């Protein structure tokens, strides 16, 4: 019993101490809050400072959140546009391959080609026969080529020697370097659409002249004998500016967005939307009908040429842009943090490499345009922030003036009180 009583007294004592501590803590908190409240009421200048600090924090947090959201949406938009462009391009390239295969497997075409190729160990003995076969091929291919916008053709045997062609100067040649890459793949049984390259024969330009080294490309399909062995190739000539580049031009958006294709050497194989600007920058020759296709390398000039910067080294010695260097390695990526393009302008972009066609495709837009809404928001905030700072300074100055007047009034009151006390003492 005695132990129980001592325990109860101890419990009551502990409870009393706890209550005492809580009361003390509450009183301390209350006094602190009271002093803080009095300070804030007395020192009015502190409110604008607090508002500035809070606004700065909110602005910083909001900008980060908005920038993150914008980058996410921009990344998604660039990737979607690139995917659509690549899908359209791959569909078009597949159609070209299907067209070439269809003609290479045509009975009439195969019969003419078999006569040109001859049986193993034999050659065409009479030029008249070869010329007649050439005319027959021209007649058989003409309707198909016209309906599908092909501008020429050639046929080779298995040794890659050209046996017939719409351009007679090609017949008999087996040393055209530009043709060797895709012909080698065709002899392995592939149907190949070549990237655009400079023509080795004359092509009619807009002025009506025939010019060499104009952009051209070929779709080439294997020709098989009755045992399904590859015995030759049929190549159909395409003008890339008619459909190939037009598909990519559909990927332009805004004032600076563009989609373009390029080869393994970093040369653009479609047109840039900035051809006129590139002439003024000296990146393209100032000539009639000057175009960027096959003339412009995607190299980083190390500075913004549109702002007056000029590199002090040859363009061939400049590195590829970040995008091009990544793509030619076979990589696909999106960059919304910014990198320099072939003009030296900071851009954001998405890119991919299409290995079966040996070309890369990129979609880019100027960084300034992509983040223009964020820049407008940021400028608006800084204007408001500056106005708030001016208000804070004005209130701070007003508070100092009020505080000085208050001190002077208090001093005058004290002096008056002292004078009154002295007067009463004399009385």
Please name every model-derived segment.
Residues 425-427:
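Conserved small/polar residues in nucleotide/adenosyl-binding loops
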């Amino acid at each position: 019993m005695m132990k129980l009583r001592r325990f109860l007294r101890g419990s009551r004592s502990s409870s009393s101490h706890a209550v005492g501590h809580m009361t003390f803590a509450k009183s301390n908190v209350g006094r602190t809050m009271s002093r803080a409240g009095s300070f804030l009421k007395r020192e009015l200048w502190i409110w604008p400072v607090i508002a500035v600090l809070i606004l700065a924090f909110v602005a910083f947090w909001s900008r980060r959140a908005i920038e993150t959201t914008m980058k996410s949406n921009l990344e998604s938009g660039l990737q979607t546009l690139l995917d659509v462009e690549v899908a359209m391009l791959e569909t078009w390239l597949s159609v070209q391959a299907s067209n070439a295969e269809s003609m290479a497997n045509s009975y009439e075409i195969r019969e003419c080609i078999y006569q040109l190729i001859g049986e193993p160990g034999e050659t065409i003995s009479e030029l008249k026969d070869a010329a007649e076969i050439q005319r027959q091929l021209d007649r058989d291919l003409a309707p198909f080529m016209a309906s599908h916008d092909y501008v020429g053709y050639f046929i080779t045997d298995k040794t890659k020697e050209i046996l017939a062609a719409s351009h007679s100067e090609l017949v008999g040649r087996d040393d055209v370097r530009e043709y060797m890459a895709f012909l080698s793949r065709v002899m392995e049984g592939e149907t190949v659409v070549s990237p655009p390259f400079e023509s080795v024969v004359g092509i009619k330009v807009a002025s009506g002249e025939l010019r060499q080294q104009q952009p051209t490309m070929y779709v080439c399909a294997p020709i098989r004998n009755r045992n399904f062995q590859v015995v030759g190739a049929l190549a159909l000539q395409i003008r890339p500016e008619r459909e190939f580049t037009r598909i990519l031009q559909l990927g332009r958006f805004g004032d600076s967005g563009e989609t373009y294709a390029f080869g393994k050497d970093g040369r653009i194989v479609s047109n840039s939307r900035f051809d006129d600007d590139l002439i003024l920058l000296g990146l393209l020759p100032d000539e009639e009908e000057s175009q960027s296709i096959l003339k412009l390398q995607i190299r980083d000039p190390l500075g913004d040429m549109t702002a007056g910067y000029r590199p002090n080294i040859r363009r061939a010695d400049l590195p590829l842009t970040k995008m091009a260097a990544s793509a030619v390695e076979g990589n696909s990526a999106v960059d919304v943090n910014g990198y320099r393009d072939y003009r030296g302008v900071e851009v954001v972009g998405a890119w991919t490499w299409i290995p079966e066609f040996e070309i890369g495709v990129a979609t880019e837009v100027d960084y300034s345009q992509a983040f223009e809404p964020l820049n407008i928001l940021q400028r608006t905030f800084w204007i408001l922030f500056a106005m708030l700072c001016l208000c804070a300074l004005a209130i701070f100055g007003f508070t100092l003036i009020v505080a000085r007047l208050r001190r002077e009034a208090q001093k005058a009151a004290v002096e008056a009180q002292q004078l009154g006390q002295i007067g009463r003492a004399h009385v």
